[in-house]
Design a protein with these regions (language model features):
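Buried hydrophobic positions in well-ordered alpha/beta secondary-structure cores of metabolic enzymes
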Residues: 7, 47, 66, 97, ...
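Active-site phosphate-binding strand-loop segment of PLP-dependent enzymes
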Residues: 7, 115-173
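Conserved N-terminal alpha-helix of the aminotransferase class I/II PLP-enzyme fold
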Residues: 16-63, 85-86, 90-91, 96
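PLP-dependent aminotransferase-like
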Residues: 74-135
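Conserved C-terminal alpha-helix-loop-beta "cap" of PLP-dependent enzymes
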Residues: 78, 267-269, 273-312
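Hydrophobic beta-strand scaffold residues
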Residues: 104-105, 169-171, 281, 308
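Active-site C-terminal subdomain of aminotransferase-like
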Residues: 137-139, 149, 186-277, 281-287
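Active-site pre-lysine segment of PLP-dependent enzymes
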Residues: 151-160, 164, 175-198
Length: 312
């Protein structure tokens, strides 16, 4: 690859200078470890300003951990988690959700990465049957792994259905900042206010060096999460360096600047490539992901200059 820039993933980008500065600023003196420091408490309060004063906030190292441990907190081993077949928890987490929760994933094929109430109904036939797993969680990703967005009404409909059937709604928000920017809504509007119970809040895909947060909107669901996080090897001894990044990201509008720029660049890329001969977009670009079908013959030459992920 000749170019320093590529099109593979937001994970390939560097760290925002303001985030690096926040890490450096936190790198002074001795403070208590394991989250008992002023930086972690400050970051938790920043989250609560976005989501509500009784929000439970727990920092972890990565998105897979946020999803796997968040789902563990909400389930028993005889439960199941309903998700789209394209969901990150289903195809890109090496079975971590199943390992930690002990639950089965019930994946549903969708044309656009989005679940609907009608699709969810198709896997509820075994409820109450002791021979079958019992669905407890519906997990959606916003934006989805195909770059599509749930509307606010779609999220509310799934949440209402989940709660009517004694289930909870989990949202994988690895790119939640991009979703908020694209929807032009505050975080709480399409999460807590819409009926989401547990949220994985992503940071690394929006300018952080590393770090995600598991966010609980029902305090009872977080009752044992400190133990689950420790057992899951996600209790950072020097947690201030995760927390300080989130404070820098979320205290002002840095998160929004980053997300808007990423979304805008994705839109520009889609606009430029879609007019090329033999190229068409697989999904409408709604956030910061572009999935395009391009002629097989040109892929090797493109990869010599720019990294991207060839799909099927």
């Amino acid at each position: 690859m000749k170019s320093l820039r590529g099109f593979g993933s937001d994970n390939n980008a560097g760290v925002h200078p303001e985030i690096l500065a926040a890490i450096q600023k936190a790198n002074l003196g001795h403070v208590p470890g394991y989250g008992e420091d002023i930086y972690t408490q400050e970051a938790i309060e920043v989250f609560r300003k976005h989501f509500g004063s009784d929000t439970g906030v727990y920092f972890v190292f990565c998105g897979t951990a946020a999803n796997a441990l968040g789902l563990t907190a909400a389930t028993q081993t005889y439960n199941a988690v309903i998700c789209a077949s394209t969901a990150h928890i289903n195809v890109d987490e090496c079975g971590a959700p199943e390992k930690f929760s002990g639950c089965k994933l019930l994946d549903i094929s969708t044309p656009d990465g989005k679940l609907t109430v009608d699709l969810i109904r198709t896997v509820l036939h075994g409820r109450g049957d002791c021979h079958q797993v019992q669905p407890r969680v519906i997990s959606i990703t916003q934006p989805t792994e195909l770059g599509t967005l749930y509307t606010l009404d779609e999220i509310k409909a799934i949440a209402e259905f989940a709660h009517q059937h004694n289930m909870i709604l989990h949202m994988d928000g690895a790119r939640i900042c991009n979703a908020a920017a694209a929807m032009d809504l505050p975080f709480h509007a399409f999460t807590r206010d819409a009926g989401v119970d547990i949220l994985s809040f992503g940071g690394a895909k929006n300018g952080l060096m590393y770090g995600e947060a598991v966010v609980f909107f029902n305090p009872q669901m977080a009752e044992n999460f400190e133990f689950i996080r420790k057992q899951g090897a996600q209790l950072a001894s020097k947690m201030r360096f995760i927390a300080a990044q989130f404070t820098a990201l979320l205290s002002g509008d840095l998160w929004l600047q980053n997300a808007r720029n990423a979304n805008r660049m994705a839109g520009l890329l889609a606009e430029q490539v879609s007019v090329l001969p033999g190229v068409h977009l697989a999904q409408k670009v709604q956030a910061n992901a572009v999935f395009a079908s391009i002629p097989q013959a040109v892929i090797p030459a493109l990869l010599e200059d720019y990294f991207f992920y060839p799909g099927e």
